[in-house]
A protein has these predicted regions:
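Short linear sequence motifs
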Residues: 6-7, 29
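Surface-exposed, polar/charged interaction patches used for macromolecular assembly or partner binding
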Residues: 19-290
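Positively charged n-region of N-terminal signal peptides that target proteins for export
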Residues: 1-5
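Bacterial N-terminal signal peptides
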Residues: 7-16
Length: 290
C-alpha cells in the first residue's frame, strides 16, 4: 500500500517540478546558495495576507483559462491608488489539499495550527496604468496565474548560504534544540528528496530564522502513518528472526536521513529546502534545529 501511494505521489512530484519556475537562471543565484526559483517559488505559510488587490482578468480572456510568462493581466488597482508603471508585484494564492487525506495521524491538526498556506504563482510588472485598473506583464512565472489570484507588493527574499555538504553527519547526536515534523510540502505531496521544499511546524515565534538548518530523522517501529505498517517489525518479523527482547522506538537509535535549510519563515511554520537526503523523506518525519 505504501509503495503504491509513494508511486502516485512521486508522479505528482515530478509533474510539479516540470511545471515549476520557467526562469531558473536569475540574478543572484549561485551554487553556494538556493537559486532564484527555489527561493521565490517555494510557497509559504503565514497569517492571512491582505487580499484586496487581485488579478481580475487579462488579454485574450475569452481564450485563456490561465496566464503565464509574458502574458498581460489586469489588476484592480490603478492611478487612483498610486500604482505606477514599473511597479512590481508578487502573485500568490491560498493553497489547500483538496483531498484532505492524512498521511500520518496528526497531519490535518498540524496543518490548521501552522496558518494559511500560500502557493507562489510568480511576479508581474506594471506596464500601463489607467484610472481604476492597471495592466501588468507576467515577468516571472512559478506555474500559472488565474483570475482571483492575490497581488502583493514585491519583497525580495534572501537566499541564505549553504553549509559544506560534506559536514552531514549520519550519526549526529541529538542537538537538544526544538523538534518538529515535516507536515506537508509544495503541491501537497508526501514524498520528498533533495531540492524538495517542505513545510515544518516551527517558525519565527519559535526563534527559527532564514538560513537555519534542520536535521531530518525518524524512529524505528512507529505506527503513525495512515499506510498500514506491521506492528513490532523493528525487532521481530515472522519467519525472518526476532530479537531476544522487545524494543520500542524509544529503545533504538534514531535514523538520521537528511537535512535542509530554511528559506522562508512564518509565525508558526517554515519552508525548508532539503539539501541532502540519504533515502526517501516522508511527511511525518521528524526534524530538529541543528
Amino acid at each position: 500500500m505504501r509503495a503504491t501511494l509513494a508511486g502516485l505521489t512521486l508522479s505528482l512530484f515530478f509533474a510539479a517540478v516540470t511545471t515549476s519556475a520557467q526562469e531558473s537562471a536569475q540574478p543572484g543565484s549561485a551554487t553556494n546558495s538556493p537559486d532564484y526559483s527555489a527561493v521565490n517559488c517555494s510557497g509559504f505559510v503565514s497569517d492571512k495576507v491582505p487580499d484586496d488587490i487581485r488579478v481580475i482578468s487579462g488579454e485574450q480572456s475569452n481564450l485563456k483559462i490561465t496566464f503565464s510568462h509574458g502574458d498581460y493581466v489586469y489588476i484592480n488597482r490603478g492611478r487612483d491608488k498610486g500604482v505606477q508603471v514599473g511597479d512590481r508585484f508578487s502573485v500568490v494564492r491560498p493553497d489547500k489539499d483538496p483531498l484532505e487525506v492524512p498521511w500520518f495521524k496528526w497531519q490535518n491538526k498540524l496543518i490548521k495550527a501552522m496558518g494559511q498556506f500560500y502557493a507562489d504563482a510568480g511576479q508581474v510588472r506594471v506596464v500601463n496604468v489607467q484610472p481604476n485598473v492597471s495592466i501588468a506583464q507576467v515577468a516571472f512565472s512559478c506555474g500559472y496565474m488565474q483570475r482571483g489570484d492575490i497581488v502583493r507588493p514585491y519583497v525580495e527574499r534572501p537566499s541564505p548560504p549553504f553549509k559544506d555538504a560534506s559536514a552531514f553527519d549520519h550519526f549526529a547526536p541529538v542537538s537538544g534544540k526544538r523538534v518538529a515534523m515535516i507536515v506537508t510540502a509544495m503541491d501537497n505531496t508526501q514524498l520528498y528528496g533533495k531540492n524538495s521544499r517542505v513545510y515544518v511546524n516551527l517558525g519565527s515565534n519559535q526563534s527559527v530564522r532564514i538560513g537555519d538548518y534542520f536535521r531530518i530523522f525518524r524512529y524505528q517501529g512507529t505506527l503513525a502513518e495512515t499506510a498500514p505498517q506491521t506492528k513490532n517489525y523493528q525487532y521481530e518479523l515472522y519467519g525472518f528472526g526476532s530479537a531476544h527482547a522487545k524494543y520500542t522506538w524509544k529503545d533504538l537509535p534514531r535514523e538520521v536521513i537528511g537535512e535542509g535549510i530554511v528559506i522562508n519563515e512564518g509565525p508558526n511554520a517554515s519552508t525548508v529546502l532539503i539539501t541532502h537526503s540519504s533515502l526517501e523523506v516522508y511527511a511525518g518525519d521528524y526534524v530538529e534545529l541543528e
